[in-house]
UniProtKB/Swiss-Prot annotation:
The lineage of its organism: Bacteria, Pseudomonadati, Pseudomonadota, Alphaproteobacteria, Rickettsiales. The keyword Repressor does not apply. The N-terminal domain interacts with the head of the 30S subunit; the C-terminal domain interacts with the body and contacts protein S4. The interaction surface between S4 and S5 is involved in control of translational fidelity. This is Small ribosomal subunit protein uS5. It comes from Rickettsia prowazekii (strain Madrid E). Part of the 30S ribosomal subunit. Contacts proteins S4 and S8. With S4 and S12 plays an important role in translational accuracy. Located at the back of the 30S subunit body where it stabilizes the conformation of the head with respect to the body. GO terms for biological process: translation. The gene is rpsE.
């Protein structure tokens, strides 16, 4: 009996960054390519990965495989935004994610937009502070997404019922 593969066709792939890197050796320079890819199913799962190879397509393939391995599930509110405001940090990069009303759209810059599009978020406001390095911003965004919790998971953790958890008690901005 063969293993059932996950539906890979449903994953969207966004190439966030490609760099040509150089290694200086005795005989001259060796060139390679580095790629950073974000993949997601547009339904609450997203991952990011880095790959390096002598050709761009190989680097992109390695990055996609790494992103699939690092996929994570993010709780979404009404399948369109996040449950509460959250702050993520990575090095000198700081990212603030805020929930938004329906119809607001994705207000985010650069690599954060790629993450939210792959995640399936339709309404969010995001602000990056500090470093605008692609790797740092993506890492900070994933740090913020890891801090998200649904009211159901908070209720389970506190050994309460969902209706006992008020909105104010689980909305917090970690500064």
């Amino acid at each position: 009996m063969s293993k059932v593969k996950k539906n890979e066709e449903a994953l969207s792939e966004v190439l966030v960054d490609v760099n040509r890197v150089t290694k200086v050796v005795k005989g001259g320079r060796r060139f390679a390519f580095s790629a950073y890819v974000v993949v997601g199913d547009k339904a609450g799962r997203v991952g990011a990965g880095h790959g390096k190879a002598k050709e761009v397509n190989e680097a992109r393939g390695k990055a996609k495989q790494a992103a699939k391995k690092r996929m994570m599930k993010v709780p979404l509110y009404q399948n369109r935004t996040i449950h509460h405001d959250v702050v993520g940090k990575s090095g000198a990069a700081k990212v603030i994610l805020r929930r938004a009303k329906a119809g607001t759209g994705v207000i985010a810059g650069g690599s954060m937009r790629a993450i939210f599009d792959s995640l399936g978020v339709h309404d969010i406001v995001a602000k990056s502070i500090g470093s605008t390095n692609v790797y740092a911003m993506i890492s900070a965004t994933f740090d913020a997404l890891n801090k998200l919790a649904s009211p159901k998971s908070i209720a389970i953790r506190r050994d309460k019922k969902v209706h006992e958890i008020s909105i104010k008690s689980y909305i917090q901005v970690n500064e």
